[in-house]
UniProtKB/Swiss-Prot annotation:
It comes from Mus musculus. This is N(G),N(G)-dimethylarginine dimethylaminohydrolase 1. The modification Phosphoserine is found at residue 33. Substrate binds at residues 30, 73, 78-79, 98, 145, 268. One of its GO terms (molecular function) is dimethylargininase activity. The modification S-nitrosocysteine is found at residues 222, 274. Its EC number is 3.5.3.18.
Amino acid sequence: MAGLGHPSAFGRATHAVVRAPPESLCRHALRRSQGEEVDFARAERQHELYVGVLGSKLGLQVVQLPADESLPDCVFVEDVAVVCEETALITRPGAPSRRKEVDMMKEALEKLQLNIVEMKDENATLDGGDVLFTGREFFVGLSKRTNQRGAEILADTFKDYAVSTVPVADSLHLKSFCSMAGPNLIAIGSSESAQKALKIMQQMSDHRYDKLTVPDDMAANCIYLNIPSKGHVLLHRTPEEYPESAKVYEKLKDHLLIPVSNSEMEKVDGLLTCCSVFINKKIDS
């Protein structure tokens, strides 16, 4: 089944929901491997700049939720809601320690008058980081955080779109190595597991996507927005953090490119898409 939406509107957004990082992020956020310690002052500054790009530079209405020290991962709002058009699916995160993060997100999205669907099935798990919406269809990564039942509930929620599942073995989430870099353009990392996942997505889809291959999996996570006053906008990792991948993004001449630093969040597996949920509200005439 082909998606019934409008690909030309892909990437449009009027609002962004973000949440401030708590200091507990440094010691208690979930992470796949114990590496460098998070510099909290730097993490706060990077997050402020990220939010500033969305609000001041791009003109989105930013809904800023407060940090909660009892929820170390709460800055990663992407995992707790999937929004498409006027509907928001409040997820059931795969990590039990993150389940209470959904409460404040649900409240914020209710205030924006979205149709709210809650994932109540105790057998289902879904992290938004495993959900790639292309404008035509959904791909859902089956990972340690997201299961088949979670994918089924997403498919039931967004019935106008095809939903295909992709096994994710070596990464935290599907979007740990891919994202949309444009209306028909998938940014994908170069690792064997990333390329294997791309091949599965290509086989599952009726549509042929263009691909943008970057050397670094983490740098394949970028944010594409279609802002009427700015055109095609792409937030991507900085040349200082990922020099070779940044060179690939710089070839996208029809995009307004905005390099964004994310070194501290990455230490606890957070990437650019993790820290925002975008909503496109219809303007009442």
